[in-house]
Amino acid sequence: MSHYEAPIRVPLIKGHKTYRDITEDIARPIEERAGKLWWISLYASLVLFIYGFGCIAYTIGTGIGAWGLNRTVNWGWDITNFVWWVGIGHAGTLISAVLLLFRQKWRMAINRSAEAMTIFSVVQAGLFPIIHMGRPWLAYWTMPIPNQFGSLWVNFNSPLLWDVFAISTYLSVSLVFWWTGLLPDFAMLRDRAVKPFQKKIYSLLSFGWSGRAKDWQRFEEVSLVLAGLATPLVL
């Protein structure tokens, strides 16, 4: 008489789906035409973008005093939003990187959203120090790059320079971490692409991914290293 043996781990994907079913589920949002809800969300985001761009133009034209920087008893609009967006980015990194280090497989359901949220948040956070300068077209002056202006050089005691190094480092690690996780999906879209232009683009994005055991071994090693680098950045 046979006895019941409980599985060692609960399956991550329920419904008895095959690899083909999983591939179809992943590729469907990209290969199918966008729905009505997507277009509504796009137009709503475009309206908010135009409004935000107008506010930034007003700030640059009027002066950053419009952000309340003349009030010494509270924080100005720029540092408040900068810290808020950095906090959102840290949350995304902790969700994805820390769960990977602790081998929590269920992170696969939310890691893409968390990593994309991190990149978007860091980019948004980087805008506020640039706008805070009052002359955003001179933002490159905060970078230690050779120039022909004589004595023009960065001030390593300035918090603006600290922001440049912090944001650029955090964005670089987060971007590579996000891109590494997308390599198998880019390769899948490359193999399914019909148009030569799409196949070429996905081939470049997938970095020659073939799905061999060696690729997966390096994929896991690099992911662990990047997660180990990203986690101290938010602590």
Locate the predicted segments by residue:
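Long, contiguous internal "core" modules enriched in hydrophobic/ aromatic residues
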Residues: P29-E32, K36-I56, S151, F156-L235
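Membrane-interface interhelical loops and short amphipathic "cap" helices
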Residues: C55-T80, G134-L160, A213-F219, L235
